[in-house]
A protein has these predicted regions:
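Conserved ATP-binding/catalytic motifs of P-loop helicase motor domains
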Residues: 1-438
Length: 438
């Protein structure tokens, strides 16, 4: 598939899509490695700090000098600033050297932001290719204010004028990597598109448990739910039952560049899937929140804290993963970066950093924070499903239907409620229907 993708990118822009757990991120990372091996300049951009980290890149807001702007009017005002003009001059020079721009998690990029990206690229006369990666059936862009815009009918990137200009070749991955159970995968694929019948309903209803069964589940199950407050309460309650001493690790935040505003730094730290204050105990069940291939832990991996070690000036957390592997975890440093041209290459400037252990308590997690994770033993609390694609994202974290449970306190008919919370944006359905995928 990598060869095919590279051949298409030689001539066309590409939209790489597919459901959850089909290997989009893996293929993207392989492509980046291949380009770098060939000494081709490819830049990986994420819609958030976490997605940027996962593909070894920077955020698209940082790279394209978008600041906090969410529409062209605000961007035009920002661009009149002298410091901004200097940044844009550097960006223009950098774009002349880049052969491929990759934008990950495109479903989280709004039409307005994508239009601003188009504005930047057109002004810079960018001649390279663009690869956008993601699944519009998953979580949509976060829109702070539902205000009147040019894209009022739909907030997705595919509704922007720039999307049409790019004339993408569409590729869809469809071979499951997360689960080996084809019946489960096929049912997930159908509800992803909003299709529901009695057979599918019966399958998911058979996974339902009541409160007593929930309480009797082993602690190695992770509960996914829609609201932060419930997640925090569950994790706090489970942690308080452990009799070992409480240990708190505070994230170490450093501003390396004085140009970075405090609110910009706070926003960046908040978008990472780490805790500014991590409270743990020996014996606590944790989940890893990032991929670190070199150290053998991955986003969604779980384990139990065996010990907390203080050696000279270093601190380690000894964790036994569910598969029995022992990890001696060190704090991880995330960098806020910007790219700058240096001759025919580019250099990375560090603007800020935050250092923290990349774990959280695993008893409960919000659905939004679980995107991209594979979870072996999973309970989906479906009481507070409110967003398009949210139910599908929650259920598709599971690797095995035999260790997937569905919990709800709703007294109404399960089938009626399940159908009601299976929210799919009609614009997304229409988009996939009218486009051909290779």
């Amino acid at each position: 598939m990598l060869d095919k993708l590279e051949k298409i990118l030689a001539y066309d822009n590409v939209f790489l899509s597919g459901g959850a757990g089909v290997g989009k991120s893996f293929l993207t990372n392989e492509l980046i490695k291949s380009y770098r091996k060939q000494k081709k300049l490819a830049i990986a951009l994420g819609s958030s700090a976490l997605s940027a980290f996962n593909i070894g890149g920077v955020t698209l807001h940082s790279f394209f000098c978008l600041g906090y702007c969410d529409d062209m009017m605000k961007l035009s005002a920002l661009d009149r600033n002298q410091k901004q003009k200097e940044k844009l001059t550097k960006l223009k020079e950098l774009l002349k050297t880049i052969e491929l721009i990759i934008i990950d998690e495109i479903s989280m990029v709004s039409a307005s932001v994508f239009e601003m990206i188009g504005f930047r690229l057109k002004n810079s006369q960018f001649n390279g290719k663009i690869l956008v990666v993601g699944d519009f059936f998953q979580l949509p862009p976060v829109i702070k204010e539902k205000k009147e815009t040019l894209f009022n009918h739909s907030y997705y990137a595919f509704s922007s004028f720039f999307w049409q200009d790019l004339n993408f070749k569409n590729i869809k991955l469809s071979q499951p990597k997360r689960t080996q159970n084809m019946e489960f995968y096929n049912y997930l694929s159908l509800i992803r598109q909003g299709f529901l019948d009695e057979k599918i309903l019966s399958f998911f209803e058979s996974l339902r448990i009541d409160y007593k069964e929930l309480e009797n589940l082993e602690d190695d199950y992770t509960l996914l739910c829609g609201i932060n407050k419930k997640v925090n309460n569950i994790n706090q309650e489970k942690l308080s039952k452990l009799e070992t001493p409480l240990v708190c690790f505070k994230a170490q935040v450093k501003k390396e560049d004085k140009r970075i505003k405090d609110e910009e730094l706070d926003s960046w730290v908040g978008s990472l899937n780490i805790l500014e204050e991590l409270n743990i105990k020996i014996g606590a069940r944790i989940i890893f929140c990032v991929n670190n291939w070199d150290k053998n832990y991955y986003n969604g991996d779980q384990g139990i804290i065996e010990d907390i070690l203080y050696e000279e000036e270093k601190i380690y957390i000894s964790i036994i993963k569910n598969n029995g592997m022992k990890i001696l975890l060190e704090p991880y440093t995330f960098f806020m970066e910007e790219l700058e041209q240096s001759g025919k290459d580019f250099v990375v400037n560090i603007l800020a950093s935050v250092t923290q252990f990349p774990i959280k308590l695993a008893y409960a997690i919000t659905i939004h924070k679980s995107q991209g994770m594979s979870i072996e033993k999973l309970v989906c609390d479906i009481d507070h499903i409110f967003e398009n694609g949210q139910l599908y994202v929650a259920l598709s974290r599971a690797t095995n239907p035999n260790t997937l449970k569905i919990y709800s306190t709703k007294k109404i008919n399960f089938g009626f409620y399940f159908a009601n919370i299976l929210k799919i944006d009609s614009n997304v359905i229409e988009f996939y229907k009218k486009h051909n995928f290779l």
